[in-house]
Amino acid sequence: MFPMVTGFMNYGQQTVRAARYIGQGFMITLSHANRLPVTIQYPYEKLITSERFRGRIHFEFDKCIACEVCVRVCPIDLPVVDWKLETGIRKKRLLNYSIDFGICIFCGNCVEYCPTNCLSMTEEYELSTYDRHELNYNQIALGRLPMSVINDYTIRTISNSPQIIIK
């Protein structure tokens, strides 16, 4: 055959192949158009956190025996434990306990190794402030229970698990 005719045949085949690829990509795009959106509208919708979510640490002052295990197991020596030795009863008395959440890596070692279970992880994750010094929580701030996302009537909660529709 003539080289010009073969060139036109190759060009025609390439054009058909390109149109097929564009059509396949367009079909994939159309199949995604029917799906629900993945993103959530954050201030008005919130995800329900899992049971094992590691949020802000909750501290119970009455249970703490000032053993400082939490300080020893913390990779960055973060919790500040101030105590005084009571000579009459030969026990430590806790004076102050604080954690700076601007530095905390939320590893959960302090909660896991606490012998009296005075530390626990909450589902609170909204810790943003304009001043980093406000992230230093003392025992009073650590003792406050966070408001649950489920109980907040102004917010629509969205489950983390994928929705299964049974037909």
Swiss-Prot record:
One of its GO terms (molecular function) is iron ion binding. It comes from the Eukaryota. [4Fe-4S] cluster 2 binds at C74, C104, C107, C110. [4Fe-4S] cluster 1 binds at C64, C67, C70, C114. Keywords: 4Fe-4S, Chloroplast, Iron, Iron-sulfur, Membrane, Metal-binding, NAD, NADP, Plastid, Plastoquinone, Quinone, Repeat, Thylakoid, Translocase. InterPro entries: 4Fe4S_Fe-S-bd, 4Fe4S_Fe_S_CS, NADH_quinone_OxRdtase_chainI, NDHI. One of its GO terms (biological process) is photosynthesis, light reaction. The keyword Hydrolase does not apply. Its cofactor is [4Fe-4S] cluster. Belongs to the complex I 23 kDa subunit family. This is NAD(P)H-quinone oxidoreductase subunit I, chloroplastic. It comes from Eucalyptus globulus subsp. globulus.
